Design a protein with these regions (language model features):
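Membrane-topology and secretion signals of cell-surface/extracellular proteins
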Residues: 3, 8-19, 42-45, 81, ...
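Acidic, metal-coordinating catalytic segment for phosphate/diphosphate chemistry
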Residues: 13-51
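N-terminal strand-loop-strand
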Residues: 39-75
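Conserved Nudix-box catalytic region and its N-terminal flanking loop in Nudix hydrolases
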Residues: 60-101, 164
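Active-site segment of metal-dependent pyrophosphate-handling enzymes
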Residues: 100-147
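NUDIX/MutT-family hydrolases
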Residues: 138-142, 149-179
Length: 186
């Protein structure tokens, strides 16, 4: 199965948590059906990306990275690559690369979708493309509390935060954390 086929199957079968997530799911499925290159960075004005929110095993801490280009704290994630076999594999690769944590186990079922504008998404660093929309498919991974991350070239910092004291008030991130915790904590 190709990455495109996996993305279409995953999102077609996914049960959204609420009406907002369902609308995004439908939008992503429509985009995949309309664009054979929807899983590539070249697809404009929108393409799929994959992300992972890393939680401590007790569900009380979240690992975030201070994104080098955006200058904001995010979950791990990025563009899909041709050799990714699935959305979950891409989410795993991105989280491993950006956190430096080996042995991550990523839940293959997405936990959250996020559509957001990115002004710095370029194929050629010297050629601006305008605003590109990332259709982010987010997963969750759990690691032992206190696991030491490593800062990658894509981040200015990587650190643990209490889930009730994250450095953002963006509802999208707060929803991701809530849904991820609901998925992994009893």
């Amino acid at each position: 199965m190709s990455l495109h086929q996996d993305a279409l199957a995953t999102l077609t079968d996914w049960t959204a948590a609420d009406p907002v997530q369902e609308r995004l799911r439908e939008e992503y499925v429509d985009h995949l059906r309309a664009h054979a290159d929807a899983c590539t960075k070249a697809c404009a004005p929108a393409h799929l990306t994959a992300g992972t929110l890393v939680l401590s095993d007790d569900g009380r801490q979240v690992l975030l990275n201070l994104h080098r280009k955006a200058g904001r704290w995010f979950a791990f994630g990025g563009h899909l690559e041709y050799d990714d076999s699935s959305l979950a594999a891409a989410a795993h690769r991105e989280a491993t690369e950006e956190s430096g944590i080996t042995g991550l186990v990523v839940d293959p079922v997405p936990v959250h979708l996020s559509r957001h504008a990115v002004d710095f998404c370029r194929i050629d660093p010297d050629v601006p493309r305008g605003t590109i929309w990332h259709h982010d498919v987010r997963h969750v991974a759990v690691v032992p509390a206190g696991t030491d991350p490593v800062v990658s070239d894509e981040s200015l910092a990587v650190r643990w935060f209490p889930v009730d004291d994250v450095p953002t008030d963006e509802q999208d991130m707060l929803d991701l954390i809530r849904l991820a915790r609901e998925r992994v904590t009893p």
